[in-house]
Structure formats: structure tokens, C-alpha cells
Amino acid sequence: MNWSNTPSFLEKQRQRLKRYQFQIKVSEQGRVVSVGDGIIWIKGLPGAAIDEILISEDECCIAMVFHLTEELVGAVMLVQTKKLKAGTPIFPLKRVLSIPVGDKLLGRVIDPLGHPLDGGEIPPHEEQGLLDRLSPHILHRDFVNRPLYTGNKMLDNLIPIGKGQRELLIGDNGLGKSALALDIVMNQKDKKVYCVYVLIGQKRSTVSSTIQLLKKANALDYTTVVVAQATALPGLLYLAPFAGCAIAEHWMKKGLDTLVVYDDLSAHANSYRELSLLLRRPPGREAFPADIFYLHSRLLERSTCLSPAMGGGSMTALPIIETKEGEMATYIPTNLISITDGQIFFDESLFSSGFLPAIDITKSVSRVGAKAQHPQIKKESGRMKLDYLQFLDLELFTRFGAKLDAKMQKQIQKGRVLREILKQERFSPLPIEFQLAWLIAYNEGFFDESNLEDIPQILKKIEKEIKQSNLSLGSPREQWKKAIKEWLMA
């Protein structure tokens, strides 16, 4: 080696010093004033911004700025720790919260910060999605024009849902709202729809049973579960729906179809009320802060159908809300009804009578879903909802002993047959071809002479034959009619 051509050590250092540029780095530091109930009050941090991340010196504490006053900064804790106390230094990171996103989250169970809860590896951080961001611009949106098949006879025909729609599931506790949402998720198998199921404030047993049901139906292959249990910090309960939305939003912007279930937003609203009261914000109606409507609209407006120029992806939202004694006119339910594109109302009296799913047709509506229905389904369902509502009115008269003519008696019998057809067991989504088959059979009068107790067996026979046939939604109606007639006569 020729040492004479090698620069000396001193020469190297001299060149390095010439290239060095002195820069002043200013960092803020605050100090904890008090800690309690998941809230941290901090003195200092004059440059703090809402939603900014804060950490302690040893990074044992992660918090988020939630409230600003002239003297103090109010932050919500996102990690439980006993090391935090008055006087602990706190530093801002000058960035907002984000979560890992992408296909590697499929089949995973995570918390709102992206930490694994299923014992698996930490999700990769190559792709990050902001938890809170602006909804897509109006010019970047498209009309809801493609159906999202739910596998439910009542929804796919009478209350249709389109991709990019926001449909509220509302009703008292224990009436089957979550079961219907799980049915819809299970029905997306092989339909190229990625699902995100967000569990907010649920018991450990409920979380466990939900995950087991998804595993049993092989639905976890295309689903991500975001969990903030009832025992979690209020800050995590608040962030859970935004985390689920960020995960689905990433796929939507890639041109994919996604479905998000928020189970449920009652717990989310309660956690936000708790945080707001602890931070001494002025309470409003039912002690909720004044911006609770903005909170939920900001979340749900991110669900949409993007225009072809933006990739054509969609995010369908199914928020769940709990009522008390069937009262829809309380604060949070009325807010969400006005934000969403329709609601599916679950009635306790229907549940008690054995009509499952206990959906009240008279109070349920889909404002934009009909435009997304397949032409064949739309044509066959036609006036079915109106006819069913008229049947319910007629049936009410029979309870008072009113005499009805033959035409009305026939209408009542046909309505009772339809009611029996619409019954469906939990966790048993049905293919859309079967939906078309029973619609044609009903409209052609193939059920008119059947006893009500025979209806389930007839439907099972049709379902079995559908799986073995080559018929599709695009097949001619006469071909469907001929095939159904042969199945029922065999």
C-alpha cells in the first residue's frame, strides 16, 4: 500500500471542521403539574398544538395534547404508567399520531396505536396513516352506484346498502346489532372487500367471542380488528374509531373497496364526554361537549366512494349506536341519524316475538342504497317494502276483530308468508343469487299455497339447488322461473 497518497488524520479532521455548520436547535420542555384519571396537566410547552404527541424523558409515557389554556396544557395518556408524577419533564415530538397501515395488518388484532394484541409480531412501519385527517374533497367523490351485498334477506332487498354509504345500526342493547354487522363482514368473503372491525369499550368476553366468530368463518383473512376494551384508558377509547378509519382509508386510496364497523359509537361518545369533563370543558346537552356532532361527522365523512380519477376505491361505514328503551330522539342517536345515509332500527318487541333479525321496517331506511341495487333485484323487490308496510297495517285491524273481504285476506296471507321468508338465523349470510331466487318465487306466487311452517324447508331447498346451478344475476328471468318451478316440484 502506498502510504504517501493517504491523507493524514489531522488533514481529515481539518476538512471535516471546514464542512461543519453550526446550527441552533431549540427544544421545548414542560413539567407535569398533576396526573389522574388518564389526564396529565403540564406547565410550559408554549408551542404545543392540539393532537401533538408528548413523551417523557425515559419514553415511559406517551400522551396527546387535547386541551390548551393560557397557563396549562391538558393531555390524555395513551400508555398506562406509574412512573409519571408531578415535576416529570415532558417533551413535544412536533408530530401527530399515525398508525401502521397496509396489507400486513390483515388477520391481525391491534390496539389504536398499532400495537399487536394477538401475540404476533409488531406490524411494519413502512406505511403510516394519520389517525385524524381531512375527509376527501367533494370533487374527488363519486355517487354511490355499486351494491355492498350483506347476505341478509331484508337488507339486500328492502334496505339496500351501496359501497361508500354510511348506514347506522341503531337499537337497544342485545337485539342483534353486532351480530348483523358480523354477518355483513362474513359475507364479504371472496368479494374483494377489506374489512376493519373496531371494538370500542367492549368487555373482554365480547372481544374474544367476536374474534373467534371471525376466525371460525375464515373472515380474519380479509379483516383487521382494532380493540380498545372497556378497561382501556379513555384516550385509547377515543382514538379507536379514528385508527380503524385510517387503516381502511389507506386501502380506499389504493382503489380498493373497504368496510368499517364501529362497535359502538355510544362508548366512543361517552369516552369523549369523560375526557372533556375531566379537562374542565363546558358541558352541553346531556353533559356532552358542544363539538360532539363535529367529532362524529369528521369521522364518518371520511367514508365515501372515490371518483375513478382518484382510483375508484370506497369505504363503507356501519356505525353502531345503542338506545335506551327504544328512544331514538336522544342527543347522540339524532346526531348520527342526521350524519349518516340511513339507519337500520332494531325493535325489542320484534325480538321478543322471535322475528330475527329484529329489524323494524317502518323505522329503517337507506337513502342512497336503492341507486346501487342490481337491476334484476331492484325490479323484483319493486313495491315489496310498501306492500309489507300495508300488510302490517291490515294485520293490525284483524286484532280488533274487523271483518275483511277475500282480497284483503289474501293480502294478509301473502304478507305473513313474506314475514316468514324474511326471518334469518344469525351468522348465516346468504348469496345474492339466492335472494333473487326467492324474490322471483314469491312474486310468481310459488309460496301462496304453502303453510307458514313449511317456508324454512322450501327456502333451504332453493338454497341447496342454487349452489348446484349455473344461474347468475345476469341470467334471463324466464330461465330463473323455469328452474325454480322445477326445484319446488321435484
Swiss-Prot record:
Q: List the keywords (alphabetical).
A: ATP synthesis, ATP-binding, Cell inner membrane, Cell membrane, CF(1), Hydrogen ion transport, Ion transport, Membrane, Nucleotide-binding, Translocase, Transport
Sites annotated Required for activity: S364
Q: Which GO terms describe its cellular component?
A: plasma membrane; proton-transporting ATP synthase complex
Instruction: Name the top EC class.
Output: translocase
Which reactions does this protein catalyse?
A: ATP + H2O + 4 H(+)(in) = ADP + phosphate + 5 H(+)(out)
Its EC number(s): 7.1.2.2
Q: Where in the cell is it found?
A: Cell inner membrane
**So where does ATP get bound?**
G171, D172, N173, G174, L175, G176, K177, S178
Does the record bear Amino-acid biosynthesis in its keywords?
A: no
Looking at the keywords, is Transmembrane present? no
GO molecular function, a single term:
proton-transporting ATP synthase activity, rotational mechanism
Q: How does it sit in the membrane?
A: Peripheral membrane protein
Q: Which Pfam families match?
A: ATP-synt_ab (PF00006), ATP-synt_ab_C (PF00306)
Q: Which SUPFAM superfamilies does this one have?
A: C-terminal domain of alpha and beta subunits of F1 ATP synthase, N-terminal domain of alpha and beta subunits of F1 ATP synthase, P-loop containing nucleoside triphosphate hydrolases
Query: What is its biological role?
Result: Produces ATP from ADP in the presence of a proton gradient across the membrane. The alpha chain is a regulatory subunit.
Q: Subunit comment for this entry?
A: F-type ATPases have 2 components, CF(1) - the catalytic core - and CF(0) - the membrane proton channel. CF(1) has five subunits: alpha(3), beta(3), gamma(1), delta(1), epsilon(1). CF(0) has three main subunits: a(1), b(2) and c(9-12). The alpha and beta chains form an alternating ring which encloses part of the gamma chain. CF(1) is attached to CF(0) by a central stalk formed by the gamma and epsilon chains, while a peripheral stalk is formed by the delta and b chains.
- What family does this belong to? Belongs to the ATPase alpha/beta chains family.
What this protein is called in its record is ATP synthase subunit alpha 1
Q: What is this protein's gene name?
A: atpA1
